[in-house]
Amino acid sequence: MSVVNSIRAQIPPIHREGYPFIGAFALATLVLFLIWAPLGWIGTVLTIWCLLFFRDPVRVTPVREGLVVAPADGRVSMVVQIIPPPALGLGDKPLPRVSIFMSVFNCHVNRSPVAGRVERIIYSPGKFINAELDKASEDNERNSLVISTPAGQIGVVQIAGLVARRIVAFVREGQPLAAGERFGLIRFGSRLDVYLPEGAKPLVSEGQTAIAGETVLADFSLGDGGRTYRAD
């Protein structure tokens, strides 16, 4: 393998949603250099940050019935038992919920936590308060998916935050999803909530770092078979 190919192998691909932003940052940087060189270097740093924000690295997802993987990169901010939002249609009993907070430095491509079929997609307009606050799950703008699996229904909620003002979903109702498959993106900092079926036990704790498509949040499989893995 050549040196160039070795370098390319270490650079993650960029998601297409980022192209307009990266182009705008690069153009602004060029203008800033023409105005005053120090401003141009500031623009260069911001352009590099924009590239990193929209990175879309390959992830190796454990594939086995009953596994629930993280839908987002970030920090596990909450692991609680709570009644899910009525819009999800998951009942009125408390369910395990794992919340992952994404900072502006995390990769923001969202991945399906399970293999299943998208039953419902519910968009809810709202505010843009700090996504780390518990009330953000009901007050903020959000996009919710309900995914049907053999083990029950999983709720996945993309929540906008103080900086995030745009939720993007790539899927439609009735569409099948593989575990770890890309389903959306939130621009510039936000939160993902995962509502697990009743009785499921989360395997992560608050403060833990999660990697989308790889970190196992829960395992409600009845079998003891070994895991296999799929790269995407």
Curated annotation (Swiss-Prot):
Cofactor note (record): Binds 1 pyruvoyl group covalently per subunit.
Reaction catalysis annotation: a 1,2-diacyl-sn-glycero-3-phospho-L-serine + H(+) = a 1,2-diacyl-sn-glycero-3-phosphoethanolamine + CO2
Posttranslational modification: Is synthesized initially as an inactive proenzyme. Formation of the active enzyme involves a self-maturation process in which the active site pyruvoyl group is generated from an internal serine residue via an autocatalytic post-translational modification. Two non-identical subunits are generated from the proenzyme in this reaction, and the pyruvate is formed at the N-terminus of the alpha chain, which is derived from the carboxyl end of the proenzyme.
Documented EC number(s): 4.1.1.65
Cofactor: pyruvate
Pfam families according to UniProt: PS_Dcarbxylase (PF02666)
InterPro entries assigned to the protein according to its UniProt record, in alphabetical order: PS_Dcarbxylase, PSD-A
Pathways involved: Phospholipid metabolism; phosphatidylethanolamine biosynthesis; phosphatidylethanolamine from CDP-diacylglycerol: step 2/2
Disulfide bridge positions per record: none
GO CC terms, sorted: plasma membrane
Location in the cell: Cell membrane
GO molecular function, one term: phosphatidylserine decarboxylase activity
Modified residues (Pyruvic acid (Ser)): S190
Predominant location: membrane
Membrane topology: Peripheral membrane protein
Site (Cleavage (non-hydrolytic)) location in chain: G189, S190
Single Gene Ontology BP annotation: phosphatidylethanolamine biosynthetic process
Active site per the UniProt annotation: S190
Domain of life of the native organism: Bacteria
Subunit structure, interactors included: Heterodimer of a large membrane-associated beta subunit and a small pyruvoyl-containing alpha subunit.
Function per UniProt: Catalyzes the formation of phosphatidylethanolamine (PtdEtn) from phosphatidylserine (PtdSer).
Protein name: Phosphatidylserine decarboxylase proenzyme
Gene: psd
